[in-house]
Amino acid sequence: MTAEVGWKVGGKQGEGIDSTGDIYAIALHRMGYYVFTYRHFMSLIKGGHTNYKIRISNEVVRHHGDDLHVLVAFDQTTIDHNWSELVDGSVVIYDTAAFEAHKPSERNVNLCGVPLTELAKEAGNTIMKNLVAIGVSACINQLDISEFLPVVQDKFGKKGQQVVDMNMVALKLGYDYFESHYDIYFPLPSKHEKIGEHLYASGNQAAGFGALAGGCRMLAAYPITPATEIMYWLIGQLPKHGGIVLQAEDEIAAINMA
């Protein structure tokens, strides 16, 4: 059992990398772990490499860390891009239906092929390969998959119970496949005793909250990555406190409004 675990998922933008990381991070947080996440993305709507890293511990963590124990790769670029972060004996999960993984250099790293797409298809839809990957990760980290149900319910509940059930099936298929084919695990440390006494928030949410608490009551902005999340958060909060959000036609107009 390690004192902390570094986990990352990567692939092309538009493959659901952020939602995969969010579901895993939120579930871990609700289980009582401290998590610090970091998202890497390119200034493109679709395509280009993106990844989502989570540092998991039962103690407070204040940065995303340097070490990586588990990497979920939806393409070879993810392996190449993050190879130097992987620790000795770490695990790389890759989709055998998408590509045949290879090591950029010879190191003690375990390449574990899992038919993520095929298992997702078995669950009902290939788009659920992300939940299969979460199930594989839960197995590697020795987590109880039933604890993911509330998060999956929150994420997909509006689409109906059938969708929730299908995603949980996908998650379990991933867990069971890895458990029956591999014997490599990175169990997480014991959970923190004070479950629920720490918050889960993104840096953008924290920035928006800080602006609101500091007295900001007007935001003029033009939506552009990565600041758009701050704008969206304040759209939902400023009107409750007598404030307003104005979307300008460009950045210069937003500056002039302010």
Segments from the language model and where they lie:
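Active-site cofactor/cluster-binding pocket
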Residues: M1-G214, M218-A220
